[in-house]
Amino acid sequence: MRNSFKYVAPDSIRAASEYLSTEKNFFFLGGGTDLLPQIKWGLKQPSLLVDLGKIESLKGMTAREEGFFIGAMETLGNLVKNPEANRYVPVLSQSAFCVASPQIRNRATLVGNILQERRCFYVNQSEYWRQSVVPCFKLGGEVCHQSPRSQTCRAPYYSDTAPVLLALDAQVEQYDKGTFELTAVQDMIRSHIHGRGEKFFLTGVFIPYPRQGTWARFIRQGVRGAMDFASLNAAVRYTPPVNGSGPVIRIFVGASSPEPVELRETADFMIANLSRLLDLKEEVKERAVKELIKKSVLVRETAISVRAKKSSFYLVANVLEELIAAMQLKVQVSWAGLSP
């Protein structure tokens, strides 16, 4: 199928934002590593592409007074190499390093990684292949081939950076009608996944600075170390109590559901038993795996079976064991763990 669309490249945020009110069937183009293959496969058929590459104000990373800001057109490759990013948000740089290959990271943007399309064995195929099945929810139909009784699409969300951003309470900066607004990353992801095709003009990502003593880690497992999407990824953050503020534990797991899964019950149990975590270590690990099994939505994937996927859940138990050990030893690792 031959794709035909108009192409524009505005040089300002205001000029680009005007298309939100004047066009309906269009897409903003960042790195293009997710969008362009979908256009090629006929999954997206825009009448207009708005390239954001000429807008200089969308580039750059800045250490602001209350947090670290990453422009919407900053690539994952730059996020990996940038000294300030590795100083202020090294766990995010680590997760960016795990995405795909160097060639893709040099094009793909952080915002694009957040707003990537969910993938499914029955959707991400050639147009000729898709003609052999009834259109599913993602293609305008009324069925999910992964689970015919499901009332919603069950395609997994594979972003490697999203669990980290969620664990760090990050926000996205959105431009709309002449104003900049901050929205929680979690709310934006849900609007993107469960919305009705609304367009967002995101200008960057803001990560608040953590309290002193914060510890965080990112883990990932894939069939191959590069190129493949994760079979499972997770981000864990612990912030100790300081000056009357209570402790914070965030546990988010990706690639196991249509959106990242928060293990809130496990985190609450850990906070309620901070002084006994070493003795309760095995129970914590067991609770985490059980909660993940309960909240996950596992489906058939191209490179891994449901059974193999479920066996990878032990990775979450491993990183929680690492966290408990660090807490007991009072190890003040670089707050966001290891940088690449």
Regions found by a protein language model. Give the residues of each.
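C-terminal structural segment of proteins
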Residues: 1-340
